[in-house]
Amino acid sequence: GVDITAGYRSVELMKQYVARTMNEHCIGGLGGFGGLFELDCTGYKHPVLISGTDGVGTKLKIAMIMDKHDTIGIDCVAMCVNDVICAGAKPLVFLDYIACGRNIPEKIAEIVKGVAEGCVQADCSLVGGETAEHPGMMPEEEYDLAGFTVGVVDKEKILSNETMAAGDVILALPSTGVHSNGFSLVRKIFDIDANPDVLHTAPAELGGKTLGEALLAPTKIYVKPVLKVLEEVDVKGISHITGGGFYENIPRSLKKGCCARINKADVRTPALFQLMQKTGNISEHDMFNTFNMGVGMVLTVPAEQADKALEILHANGEPEAYRLGVIAEGEGVELC
């Protein structure tokens, strides 16, 4: 059956990490039937709550093979909070859900350590979670991880692309690597399932890192720099570049009749993606249709405010943000 003692031990071990995320709006502590958070509406005329949920996908298999579980939680938080900031919202709270074959307290605590670190980076509170042990349903050493966030934005400040027009500038916020999408293809490219030891090799292209280390680089959390830009710049659209790459995600923030025109030579693609393309003999179109290609998020701003937006990004944790392309008349994404 379920190991209740292990469950109690997990909670004790994770408390120190959860405590890092608490602020004056959190009411009570761990152990309640729900997480309480006092919403401060000061500064909001008409506050609107926005929610998001996501997981980490099969990147978890890389973490399991590498036996490294302390950053995968950052990925989980990032996948959720990066989505809600696309509406202009500030994340407030986060909850995690871990399903496992066997509750190994030290491993669970490492996972939650990463979740807590992600919450600190996103300036939100980890107000609850669930660890579900599924003996007989999942292999003992395996687990799955999902997360849920709630954010707030003033109704009049919900991002709208209504004024987007030809000539607007598209800015790129670099990724840390593959982030948390496309790992089923990554595993196929390097034949990881059949040859897991390949993760411990260090291809010359990766500058001394092993393949496993490069693939496990946690998804970047863009909350703080983007919120700073939103305070001073008329941002017309934000896209989180996840599964589906450029072709699926950039159009989600485009106004009808507008297209994103991007020169492929301007995309600063890290060596990891070049290694993947070469090893898997993957077409350029499929790479841009699957992976972020080194761009984790894009912001569309008026041309006259592009320099100001870049200055803010450079001063707030995104020193490598750059101009990626422009808005033109048309539909979708034009990579030329």
Could you say what each language-model-derived stretch is?
Residues 1-25:
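N-terminal amphipathic/basic leader segments beginning at the initiator methionine
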Residues 3, 54, 167, 240, ...:
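Residue-level signature of catalytic and energy-coupling elements of molecular machines
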Residues 7, 43-44, 56-59, 154-157, ...:
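Short, acidic Gly/Pro/Ser/Thr-rich loop/turn segments
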Residues 11, 109-112, 183:
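Hydrophobic face of alpha-helices
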Residues 16, 107-125, 138-145, 195-199, ...:
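Glycine-/charge-enriched secondary-structure boundary and capping motifs
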Residues 16-176:
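Glycine-rich phosphate/pyrophosphate-binding loop regions near the starts of catalytic domains
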Residues 88-90, 185, 234, 320:
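Short loop/turn motifs at secondary-structure junctions
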Residues 144, 157-210:
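Short, acidic (Asp/Glu-rich) active-site segment that either coordinates a divalent metal cofactor
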